[in-house]
Amino acid sequence: MKLLTGLVFCSLVLGVSSRSFFSFLGEAFDGARDMWRAYSDMREANYIGSDKYFHARGNYDAAKRGPGGAWAAEVITDARENIQRFFGHGAEDSLADQAANEWGRSGKDPNHFRPAGLPEKY
């Protein structure tokens, strides 16, 4: 529902043309897919201390798609952090995750968070 509300808001309030609206949708979809790929890789790697790297990488890849990708990355990461906070995960870890998310979304190199020994596949 938030996705639909956000898209309608962008369309009506910001005066987005139909062509750029569909471009935004495509970027958002591809950005969400980038986030899912980073999450899947994190689960597959199962490497201690690598979560910040995968957070930054997913946000970086999504933001490279354009404004729609960056928007999708922000919505997904905020939702994930809010859910984790609700279930009692530490606030300190959540702040570190959000810093890694913002690092990636701002276009900075996600390898800054890459732990030593993480296989090159990732």
UniProtKB/Swiss-Prot annotation:
InterPro entries the UniProt entry points to: Serum_amyloid_A (IPR000096), Synovial_Prolif_Regulator (IPR052464)
- N4,N4-dimethylasparagine is found on 101
In the UniProt record, the gene name given for this protein reads SAA1
Q: Where is this region: Important for amyloid formation?
A: 19-45
List GO molecular-function terms, semicolon-separated. G protein-coupled receptor binding; heparin binding
What effect is documented for mutating residue 78 to N?
A: In allele SAA1.4
Q: Which GO terms describe its cellular component?
A: cytoplasmic microtubule; endocytic vesicle lumen; extracellular exosome; extracellular region; high-density lipoprotein particle
- Cleaved signal peptide residues: 1-18
Q: What is this protein called?
A: Serum amyloid A-1 protein
Q: In which tissues is it expressed?
A: Expressed by the liver; secreted in plasma (at protein level).
What is its biological role? Answer: Major acute phase protein.
Tell me which Pfam families the record gives. SAA
Is Signal among this UniProt entry's keywords? Answer: yes
